[in-house]
Amino acid sequence: VPRVLRLVAACALTVAAVLPSSAAAKVPQGFFGVMVDGPATETPGILEREAPRIRAAGAQTVRFAIDWASAQPYATAAEVPEAERARFTDVDGVPTDLSRSDRIVRLLAAQGLRPLPVILHAPDWAAKFPGSLLTDPRRYASPPSGPEPYARFVAALARRYGPTGSLWSTVPPQRRRPIRTWQVWNEMNLNVFWNEPDFQEGYVPLLRATRAAVRAVDPRALIATGGLTNGSVPAWTALRRIYEAGGRGSFDVVAIHPYTRSAAGVLATVRATRRVTAARGQRTIPIVLTEVAFSSSGGDSPDARRFATWDTTERGQADRLRSTFRLLARQRRALGIGGVSWYTWLSPQARRANWSSYAGLSRLSGDRIVRKPALLTYRTTVRELSR
């Protein structure tokens, strides 16, 4: 990580030196978004209360996770315990429970928000490294054993939530927000999400199979790569490996998670990513930042020292958010930036948690939700930059 961050910092100095001073250009509808996870989606009642606030903050796209392992934990109906059978329906021969994602998609659509799902986590029956998370840490990070079960699952999601999806049959037309973009996995260049060397060897077939399966349901659907982040392998190098493994043509959107110390560093990662796509003849393929954030632990997080480059105070978090959004809006056309989502809406912020637990625009404090300075800054900056 330190070497990657030094590279980003060096590029950022160049970026900062050439930035125009003119006001940021306005962005189209859907450009700004936010992630909902953790307590926002897992604690009963919170998303019901927070979805209107997300809309009021100016977010137009909301990214959320669909956990494949939770939706399809059993390979066959015979494996389902009798006490659980009522919650499953048969989908392509696999017992499936979509109640969690149904709830989230309905809540977001009711507020006029665009759902952006990231689909990850292989169930044991479809995992390359099956086994309990408690006894085998690879379980959480295991890639699928093959691409087809995952591709069939995402195609089933498209039949449920796409333009002709069955979910919308009871929803008034004006309140429908069908899903058109599907994000395949998350941060595959980190072993906490894909615990196998040379991730691209298994990931490119997954992309290709998923795109074919989803396009058979919705010919205009878009497939986004999982968010490539600046880990030990930087985002642009990970993307280059996807291309080298034959990935061109298997995705429609490049997604990145440019965690770094500053707005200029974020833009430097976007520029490096664009150089890779241009070298492969894809100068105009959209680049979307499906996560960007700065931690506000102020050094309180135990890994703040390790990730000090993007750790700051609550006030510093708000300032960096404003700078980052303005810079991305200003460079949107030149670099083909398709959107940016803040990670995350609501943090648990248990004391001395890891850095990501301080990334939210709001935080839990006991049973209360505390609004951080970054939330007001998000709202005012999005209003400033939106058409």
Regions found by a protein language model. Give the residues of each.
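Noncatalytic carbohydrate-binding groove/subsite architecture in carbohydrate-active enzymes
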Residues: 44, 151-180, 195-315, 322, ...
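Boundary/entry segment of secreted carbohydrate-active catalytic domains
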Residues: 25-61, 65-67
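Bacterial N-terminal signal peptides
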Residues: 8-18
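Acidic-and-aromatic substrate-binding clefts and catalytic sites of carbohydrate-active enzymes
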Residues: 37-48, 67-73, 92-98, 124-126, ...
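Substrate-binding cleft and catalytic face of glycoside hydrolase catalytic domains
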Residues: 57-231, 283
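Conserved, mostly hydrophobic/aromatic
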Residues: 34, 62, 108, 157, ...
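Aromatic-rich peripheral "rim/lid" segments of glycoside hydrolase catalytic domains that contact
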Residues: 78-83, 178, 183, 188, ...
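Sec-dependent signal peptide recognition
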Residues: 3-10, 166
